[in-house]
Amino acid sequence: MPRRAGSGQLPLPRGWEEARDYDGKVFYIDHNTRRTSWIDPRDRLTKPLSFADCVGDELPWGWEAGFDPQIGVYYIDHINKTTQIEDPRKQWRGEQEKMLKDYLSVAQDALRTQKELYHVKEQRLALALDEYVRLNDAYKEKSSSHTSLFSGSSSSTKYDPDILKAEISTTRLRVKKLKRELSQMKQELLYKEQGFETLQQIDKKMSGGQSGYELSEAKAILTELKSIRKAISSGEKEKQDLMQSLAKLQERFHLDQNIGRSEPDLRCSPVNSHLCLSRQTLDAGSQTSISGDIGVRSRSNLAEKVRLSLQYEEAKRSMANLKIELSKLDSEAWPGALDIEKEKLMLINEKEELLKELQFVTPQKRTQDELERLEAERQRLEEELLSVRGTPSRALAERLRLEERRKELLQKLEETTKLTTYLHSQLKSLSASTLSMSSGSSLGSLASSRGSLNTSSRGSLNSLSSTELYYSSQSDQIDVDYQYKLDFLLQEKSGYIPSGPITTIHENEVVKSPSQPGQSGLCGVAAAATGHTPPLAEAPKSVASLSSRSSLSSLSPPGSPLVLEGTFPMSSSHDASLHQFTADFEDCELSSHFADISLIENQILLDSDSGGASQSLSEDKDLNECAREPLYEGTADVEKSLPKRRVIHLLGEKTTCVSAAVSDESVAGDSGVYEAFVKQPSEMEDVTYSEEDVAIVETAQVQIGLRYNAKSSSFMVIIAQLRNLHAFLIPHTSKVYFRVAVLPSSTDVSCLFRTKVHPPTESILFNDVFRVAISQTALQQKTLRVDLCSVSKHRREECLAGTQISLADLPFSSEVFTLWYNLLPSKQMPCKKNEENEDSVFQPNQPLVDSIDLDAVSALLARTSAELLAVEQELAQEEEEESGQEEPRGPDGDWLTMLREASDEIVAEKEAEVKLPEDSSCTEDLSSCTSVPEMNEDGNRKESNCAKDLRSQPPTRIPTLVDKETNTDEAANDNMAVRPKERSSLSSRQHPFVRSSVIVRSQTFSPGERNQYICRLNRSDSDSSTLAKKSLFVRNSTERRSLRVKRTVCQSVLRRTTQECPVRTSLDLELDLQASLTRQSRLNDELQALRDLRQKLEELKAQGETDLPPGVLEDERFQRLLKQAEKQAEQSKEEQKQGLNAEKLMRQVSKDVCRLREQSQKVPRQVQSFREKIAYFTRAKISIPSLPADDV
């Protein structure tokens, strides 16, 4: 090691000589031993002998630092005659080895869990196949005997033909779904096992006697990495070609049955004609040779550039805010650790499904050994599920919510980067104008970041590992069924409850839950079941929006004052909670034999009592629709048996979800925010409903929620809870469950489901959600049948009661439609006799079962009629009080008429000779015809009366909807309509949110807060922009410099750039090599799958087929793949270039997020990067599915 010459230099020992080799490097000759050495013999006296004695960046005796243009800085150990790329003074390599060993234990546990999950799915598939065969045999056997199949008796040995058909089709679809899931899981398991073995080999290789790679080995690995990268690049090009060929093949098939011809070419297809037209229009708009006035064109170009510049600046500001929000979220210890927790929860769910299918297995034609084996398997599963009772879930639910928030922010960030890239390209196309694009030269602009991105991917070691190799875009599609099941499994307390479902809310919390007071009834149950809570506190948005008056490049331009998001409830939270139900959910139940049950033609529809239930969420029509369309069962928005709330409906306004409980609390359904109802002294006293009244109700009732999602064509059925089960005499050894069927059944839709079994108690909380993938037109021709069944200790099933719901008038809105339904006993269900009896709830001459049921119904009818009378009297009294103050706002004669008719229908059979007032006309809203308490589903025959009265009513003054939070006018409207929850504090509530009731327009620009307004001048140092603290302006001074002059890069920036480069180790190099090999292997599998799919489609096309295979049409993964291929084929070269630029920008943004997280959470970037590298091997996302298995 040569040293600098100096006056105080020690002389060489006797017999030593200094020399230089052919490249000028200094070495030393020991003539005494006739040897040469690179080590200066004088270093023994001047340098430390070990690393423990080193100070600062000092190297010990025998060590030297070198530089290689390909590798960079490396270190030489002259004593052992070795080289290495790690810095021997740092302990980073040891920390890497420790993290690798820790992750191996975590990955081994995850692999074991997924193998067990695969085994449980195999058991379910075998059981479903066996049950499918048995059901087919039973159908053939029963269909041969007409009397046995269509017998009207309720014996459990008979089959209902409709239920049996639905059972067979559902089992068949379950078999196909399990086959697809097992095929995908098998491939994922293979990839994860390979990745785990690779990590084990790396750990064994790098933690043994081998200390690290030498310089020559590192160079060889880099050369191999470059060759692998070239192979991967060529493979990606081949993948794009295969995707384009798939798009062309798909175009030749007839996806739509109405189209009778095939398109020979993708570019000439009518599907893409609008795309071609839009591109031509876009290209024409960007030409500069358009004839016309040059002045007009230049002014239009200038206005367009200003508009695009403002949008571009706003997009960059939004991107910066999203980066800050992402960096503030707590990062998980290991990437993918949350996926392991999800798989454990899904394993519990799969075991529950297997247990439920074993409970409903058909016992007929099975040997005694098979029955004993099935019983032993059931007991084993019950014990395993009981053992996870103490598993905590509150912290896991919070982590899952953070993960969902992170995914949402990442998706927004990706969309923002695409928008930014698009706007940048549009600004470049308009750069011929005289107006310069100031944003392109500003700090953090896309132009500067794009240049840095190009320089960061030049084949260096860092680029190969963190930027190019381990970056994965957000293109991984998550199975919505999987996600929704996971959300539904999350519970508020902890553990598994065998007698009830895994849910986040218990039965007593439905009525009065201190933890979630803003959720009650089914709304609260559903929101809690999906693990939904109000979103996390987001970073406050800019208080001022971009103002066109400011021509300066300001950080936060002036604008109107805004109220912070956390100050008052927003309507988006309710949309987010409802969005939880848009996830697809399909419960795979197993078949069993059923009893013959006659269909229900009529039923009583009662609303919720104080046991805690929810109102229906239905969207009001306008007045014309109210007069034309029949009333459906969801119009009962005001529950009679609960404390009354006045709901004033306006045109185009959605109804409010009102839920009442014992504690007199209500929920604002449109915002999802709890607010206690404050009774005013001027308001009337509410009709109290005590818990003792529950004992009067002797009819079993079930709470059912319905919802249709038009976007995903999914019909959601929610079995919430059951009450008054004591109406049926059920042995304590038996258990009860609900059987849900959508009839008539379809062969391509799962239409029969079962809930979990529960021991018989007075009230049971189910919270089971089922999904039916069906179109809206097909759903309107279906009937929902819900049966309450019991299963004995000897696995003998019996249908106790049931109800039927017509789906012809189902409100197709984005809200949950919830009502209570009476369960009529199977022996008591009326059959359809003639048309005049269809509108009646109870037939006048209908015989009752016994005197107990007669007394129960009589008491219920008496209580209902008395409550109706009380409501009429209160409304009449209210009208008399308000008649002298204001004119009526709408007729309520129709409302009272419907009340009287409903009451007459209910009490037609028995007692209650109660006369209702004839001349009662209370003031109520125009849309009150759609809010009828205690109205049954057959109340649509009153439509003509409602329409007649509405047409005959003279035009009245319509209430005006006023947003009190944003209104700045002092003049109040006397005819203003406010929701009941806003009635308590109408004027006092707005003041805490508004900064000043009087806006002074003399303030600068706008009345925003002055302390949040920052104006930065992007000008030279003239007297108009000189700060007050500086010296006075002196002309011709040397300090007068323009900010547009490009200054030289200071040394601090260079030092920061070199410090940001992470330290590379041999372990990093080995991980990069193995990850590249893994990526190449998986890419080859994807290419092979694409080739097989193309070959299959070409063979079908050659055979004259005009439709895609059924397995491809039914599999959502193939549908996503074909859509992606079609989208890529439609992209032009410019759009593809924009996509690549957006991807590069997204990589740069991800680096910025890591840097910000390092500053905020003190997590070193090198630790984050290394964890991502390790997790890459055990993440197996199958983007290209294999060909589906044969159908059943």
From Swiss-Prot:
WW domain sequence ranges: 10-43, 57-90
Gene Ontology cellular component annotations, sorted alphabetically: cytoplasm; cytosol
Molecular-function GO terms, alphabetical: kinase binding; molecular adaptor activity; signaling adaptor activity
Domain C2 positions: 698-821
Ranges of biased composition (kind: Acidic residues): 875-885
Key words of the record: Coiled coil, Cytoplasm, Phosphoprotein, Repeat, Repressor, Transcription, Transcription regulation
Pfam families according to UniProt: WW (PF00397)
Coiled-coil residue windows: 121-194, 224-256, 302-421, 859-887, 1068-1144
Residues recorded as bearing Phosphoserine in the entry: S286, S1022
Residue ranges, compositional bias (Polar residues): 923-933
Residue span of region Disordered: 441-462, 873-895, 911-991, 1124-1143
Subcellular location: Cytoplasm, Cytosol
InterPro entries in the record: C2_dom, C2_domain_sf, C2_WWC, WW_dom, WW_dom_sf, WWC/KIBRA_Hippo_Reg
Chain intervals for the UniProt region annotation (Interaction with PRKCZ): 1031-1050
Covalent S-S links between cysteines: none
GO biological process, any: hippo signaling
In-chain residues carrying the UniProt-annotated modification Phosphothreonine: T1004
Subunit structure: Forms homodimers and heterodimers with WWC1 and WWC3. Interacts with DLC1 and PRKCZ. Interacts (via WW domains) with LATS1 and LATS2.
Family per record: Belongs to the WWC family.
Free-text function comment from the UniProt entry: Regulator of the Hippo signaling pathway, also known as the Salvador-Warts-Hippo (SWH) pathway. Enhances phosphorylation of LATS1 and YAP1 and negatively regulates cell proliferation and organ growth due to a suppression of the transcriptional activity of YAP1, the major effector of the Hippo pathway.
Name of protein: Protein WWC2
UniProt organism field: Homo sapiens
